[in-house]
Each structure stands twice: as C-alpha cells, then as structure tokens.
C-alpha cells in the first residue's frame, strides 16, 4: 500500500507525543522545533522500514508490499547429472533484467534487481514445495549443494535456495532445478524508498511497526530514554520479538 510522507510524519509525531505523555517522561521531542523534528523523522523512515522488512514475520507481508520476479523463463541447459562441470546458458523468452543460467548441478542462478531486499517465496516447476526462507550461504551449505552426487545435493523433493553473489551482483541460487523447467512463482521485498511524489510502498500489516520503529530511532537521535520502549513495541508488532524468543528456546535446547 502506498503511504504519503506527510501521513507518516504525522503518525510518528502522534506516537511520540502519546508515549511521552503516558510515560511521564519530559518532552525531549516537543522541545525540538517542528521542522527540525520532521527532518529527523524523514531521515529515519526508510532505515526503520528496512529494519522491519528484513526481520519481520513473513506471514505479515501481503501482496501490496512485494514485487514479482519473472515466472515465464525456462531453463534450457544440459543437466548432466553426476558431473560437476558447468554447462548451458539460458536465453530468456522475454525481455528482462533477470537472467537465469543453469548447470549440471541442477542449479539455476537468477541475478536479482538492484532494489532486491528479501526473498518472500521462490518455486520452480516440479518442486514439491516452495522455498520461503533461503539457506544461509555457508561453506557447509555450498559443499552439500555442490556435491557431485545426485542423492546428496538438493532436488525437486527437497529444494534449496541460497542468496549470494554472481559476477558482483546479488543472485539467487536455486538448487533442485531441472532442464526445461521455469519459475512458477517468485516474489521479493524491495528496498523501501520514496518516489518522486513522496509516496512509499509498504505492507499494510507492518505499517504500525514501521511507525513505532521510526519513532524509536527519532527519539534515540534526540537522546530520549523512551526509544527502547518504542523499539520493543515495533518488534512485537512485526513478529520480530516472537522470532527471537523461538531462536532463544532453540538455542537453550541445543537445536
């Protein structure tokens, strides 16, 4: 959903005013000139939005805040199975900046647009299920995905997606790709930014979290001790707090 900068400024100021009044903390923000306060808020909006979008629960991301990657491209490369020698380059059937290549490791490489921030979902034809959370790009992951043995590396029953770099550009490595198969669905969260009309596209369910995170960063800049409370509220509204609690429990159990 598109939001005007003027509305965001107003909503952030409202959150700051309400919370300073309820907490009984002195008006650090109200002591600042209105224009100065708006300037500080403006500088923090996209940074706050980026933080929330990178760390939020994906179930809170709706279609109004995501972008589609092309779904009609086909993998037209020779998949040789057990050998590890790369082969084949794809010629996309449509004009696009997204290029796909495939090699003999049943891997498709999709170079990504400059505004790519976070994967929402990726799925290729023949996969039993889509991938929503990329595997961390580690040496172990690369070793498994790059194994010359077909039974070890990912396949269409257990696909894997790794975010990495290809020729200095961000790319998705989709393991479990088959010859002649294309992308059935692929969506990503773009880097949040304002357009020439001072509008910004944000997921509606995350709007309040972004407002609170912006307010928190603004108060931190102004030296108010209230910023931590608002930051905690932002994490609660976006599901980040829940994610951290689950991670902590898993760590305690040694998972």
What residues fall within each predicted segment?
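Glycine-enriched, solvent-exposed interface loops adjoining structured elements
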Residues: 1-255
């Amino acid at each position: 959903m598109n939001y005007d900068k003027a509305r965001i400024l107003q909503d952030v100021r409202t959150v700051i005013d309400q919370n300073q009044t309820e907490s009984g903390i002195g008006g650090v923000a109200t002591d600042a000139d209105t224009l100065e306060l708006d300037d500080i808020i403006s500088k923090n909006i996209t940074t706050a939005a980026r933080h929330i979008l990178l760390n939020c629960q994906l179930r809170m991301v709706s279609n109004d805040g995501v972008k589609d990657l092309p779904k009609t491209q086909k993998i037209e490369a020779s998949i040789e199975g057990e050998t590890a020698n790369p082969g084949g380059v794809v010629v996309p059937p449509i004009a696009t900046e997204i290029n796909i290549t495939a090699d003999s490791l049943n891997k498709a490489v999709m170079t990504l647009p400059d505004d790519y921030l976070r994967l929402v979902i990726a799925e290729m034809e023949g996969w039993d299920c889509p991938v929503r959370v990329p595997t961390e790009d580690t040496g172990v992951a690369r070793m498994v995905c790059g194994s010359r043995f077909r039974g070890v590396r990912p396949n269409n029953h257990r696909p894997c997606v790794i975010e990495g770099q290809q020729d200095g550009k961000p790319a998705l490595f989709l393991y479990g790709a088959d010859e002649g198969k294309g992308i059935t669905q692929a969506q990503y969260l773009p880097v949040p930014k304002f357009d020439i009309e001072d509008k910004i596209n944000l997921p509606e369910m995350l709007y309040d979290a972004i407002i609170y995170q912006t307010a928190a960063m603004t108060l931190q800049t102004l030296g108010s001790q209230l910023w931590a409370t608002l930051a905690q509220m932002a994490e609660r509204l976006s599901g980040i707090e829940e994610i951290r609690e689950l991670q902590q429990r898993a760590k305690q159990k040694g998972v």
